[in-house]
Every structure is written in C-alpha cells, then in structure tokens.
Amino acid sequence: MLMAQMLGDKFSILMMWDRWKMLYTKTLGELGMEHKCASMRSIGVTPDNKSLLAGKEDEVFPLLLQAAEKCVEEDGAQVLILGSTTMHEAHFWLSERIGVPVINPGPLTYKLASIALDLNLTHSKATWPTPLSPKHDMIRAIGAAGAAYLEGKQ
C-alpha cells in the first residue's frame, strides 16, 4: 500500500474472494490510509494455494481484468495491488492490458528486503525487539524461494 502511494494518489486492491476484505480493511486502518483506497474488488474465486492459477488462466484472468477495469474506470484507481500472491501469475498479463501500475506483492517484498540488506538497514530495535525464538531456517528458505523466482524471470 505504501508503494502504491509512491506510484499514484488512489489505489485499489484486487482480491480473489471477499473473505480477505477484513484483512485489507484492518491494514488500511492501521496505516491510516483508508482515504487513499479507491476500492477493494473481489473476483469471487476461492484461492488455490497449491496450483495457484495454473490451468485456470482462461477463467480467472478475464475476471481480474474486468475487476481491474472497474477499479480504474468507476472507482478512480491510479494503481492496482494484487491482494494475494496467489494471483502472481496474472501480473504481467494484467499489467499489459490495464494502463496503470499493477503491484505484485511477492517480488516487490523480496526486492525491498534485498535493498534493505544491501544498504545495511534494519528495523528499529527500540520498536521491534529481537525475537525470543528466531526462525533463521524459515527466513533463509523464504529468501532462497524469492531468489529462485526472480532468477526464473530473467
């Protein structure tokens, strides 16, 4: 959401299903960004965390485009956010067709973390103390998966 504000004034969130709306509403409130969200639109498709959108492109991609067009034309969104990494396969396809920036949260988060590491930036320990039980293996696995994904895109 913060990146969306760097790219435009108003943004919309595309969701797979309505069950996630409360999570975005909560985050918007915590960030004080309710007034910057043009809309949240669901395509009414239950997310598939295993096969994602594979084999469903002909069904799901047009639904995403239809919702995205409503976000831009009816709601005034200047930036779109894919509300879940389960939609990442539609990012390039949708970006080519909609005319406004489309944020893909997975690769963006990976790149931001990489930049922070390169610049030796870390969180404020005054705000966020060191965890009692660090999960180093999990963090390494997330980093490796992100790197593998980006290598496959180049």
Task: Please state what every model-predicted region is.
Residues K70-V72, G76, S95-E96, W128, ...:
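Metallocofactor- and cofactor-centric catalytic cores in central/energy metabolism, strongly enriched
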Residues M1, M16-R19, P105-Y110:
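Short, acidic/turn-prone active-site loops that include or flank metal/cofactor-
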Residues R19, T27-G83, A90:
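Active-site rim beta-loop-alpha module in soluble metabolic enzymes
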Residues E89-E96, I115:
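Catalytic cores of alpha/beta
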Residues Q5-S42, A116-Q154:
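Short, glycine-/small-residue-rich phosphate/pyrophosphate-handling segment
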Residues L7, R97-I98:
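Short, structured coil segments at secondary-structure junctions
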Residues I103-T122:
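Short, flexible loop segments at boundaries between secondary-structure elements
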